[in-house]
Amino acid sequence: MPRFFINESPSRQAIITGEDSKHITKSLRMKVGESLVLCNGQGMDYHCTISSMDEHQVVVSVNSSVPTISEPSVSVTLYQGLPKSDKMDSVVQKAVEMGVTRIVPMLTQRCVSRPDQKSAQKKVERWQKISFEAAKQCGRGILPPVSPLTDFSAALRQSASESTVLFFYEGGGQSLQQCIDSSCKAYPIFIGPEGGFSEEEVQFALDLGAKKATLGPRILRTETAPVAALAAIMLTTGNMT
């Protein structure tokens, strides 16, 4: 069933305009009486029926509302060392598909890509659009935000003050089964850029109480590691069934 995000929580009816209205009328060629789903981006789905439409808008009647079933029971924030080229585009897209709650791009010692403030802002805006499209495509109940580019040490201090950090390191560490606490519902995960984290960064993370975690004996690319980590977390916490 076609599904669209809206910026409100409708009661009896909702009005769809802009690109979504065009998509409904022009691309999908939907008719009055057909059904679609609206999501408020806060985990609620609204099952609707088209009651009227014209070239500018589509009006729908709300039949029922239910919690979105696609949202995981755990919150995962991905802190991703900024990779080269357009690899971050893929990281954002796949992370949203895998159930990430928030994405924080960060600069680490081994980051090659170091955009200036203006370029970084444009990149974040593009990544947010990618997140939005991925959330629409895979039926998410929220729109995972992409935070402004931040510094590694600031990101680690902030996340470590809120929850136990899972620090993925190619030099080895605990398995996810050992790291995951069944009572914990929020996981900040750190993934390095090409070349991984420096020894200094690893020690800094451990000093702040982070758990050094491993994704197995193989060294994964920076764009592969977050997808593998998210999949493993979702599986371990029962969110892949």
What residues fall within each predicted segment?
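RNA substrate-binding interface of SAM-dependent RNA methyltransferases
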Residues: 63, 69-164
